[in-house]
């Protein structure tokens, strides 16, 4: 994570890392990084909970624009200025992955299906519904603040953005794959579809 933070520091002044109950020494590494705020969950609550904690804290600190990115090194921090620049006149910016050659066929199909499913339910033509590299205004966050605790958070954001008719743009991003592809599991995909249907029906 240190290399990720070193890269982010070149493009952002205020950095928040949420340690979601990890036991691999991540928190100790982050504490040694100057200019980085560390938030910790005592136990693992899931990605949705971790990102929500970070966003809540940022908004309370007076942030106007929030940029979300994963800490595993797959997101290139050099894209941060592009996200901020693209925020002009819109509420949310979604990044979509252009390089998916290392993604197994099953995951490619799953992403395509979720994209079509999202369009059918909410009318949103989001090219990468599970991409985690995104940005939004603090006002937009207050409207789309999600309840999901895990990977379905990305799709809930889209659902709420459609519900509130928020303006959005999409920009292509290159994903840096360091190891075998890791993504949303098949079981997570089914859970996401179920949650999407409930959001659409207002359940």
Question: Which residues does each PLM region occupy?
Answer:
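A conserved acidic beta->alpha catalytic loop
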Residues: 19-27, 73
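Catalytic donor-sugar/metal-binding loop of nucleotide-sugar-dependent glycosyltransferases
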Residues: 125, 149, 158-176
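Acceptor/aglycone-binding surface of glycosyltransferases and processive sugar-polymer synthases
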Residues: 37, 41-60, 77-151, 177-187, ...
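Short, well-formed alpha-helical segments that are part of the catalytic scaffolds
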Residues: 1-11
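Short beta-strand-to-loop acidic/aromatic patch adjacent to the donor-nucleotide binding site
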Residues: 63-72
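Residues at the starts of beta-strands that form the adenosine-phosphate
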Residues: 13-15, 65, 167
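Short, conserved active-site loop motifs that form the nucleotide-linked donor/cofactor pocket
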Residues: 13, 36-37
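Acidic helix N-cap motif at the loop->helix transition within catalytic regions
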Residues: 2-3, 24-32, 78
């Amino acid at each position: 994570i240190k290399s990720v933070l070193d890269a982010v520091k070149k493009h952002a002044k205020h950095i928040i890392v949420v340690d979601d109950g990890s036991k691999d020494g991540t928190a100790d590494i982050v504490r040694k990084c100057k200019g980085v705020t560390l938030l910790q969950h005592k136990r693992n609550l899931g990605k949705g909970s971790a990102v929500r904690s970070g966003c809540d804290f940022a908004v309370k600190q007076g942030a106007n624009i929030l940029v979300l990115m994963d800490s595993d090194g797959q997101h290139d921090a050099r894209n941060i200025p592009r996200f901020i620049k693209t925020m002009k006149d819109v509420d949310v910016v979604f990044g979509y992955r252009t390089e998916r050659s290392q993604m197994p066929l099953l995951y490619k199909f799953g992403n395509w299906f979720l994209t079509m499913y999202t369009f059918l339910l909410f009318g949103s033509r989001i090219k990468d519904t599970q991409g985690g590299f995104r940005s939004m205004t603090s006002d937009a966050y207050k409207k789309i603040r999600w309840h999901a605790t895990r990977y379905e958070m990305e799709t809930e954001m889209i659902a709420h953005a459609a519900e509130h008719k928020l303006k959005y743009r999409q920009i292509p991003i290159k994903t840096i794959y360091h190891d075998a592809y890791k993504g949303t599991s098949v079981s997570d995909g089914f859970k996401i579809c179920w949650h999407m249907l409930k959001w659409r029906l207002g359940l």
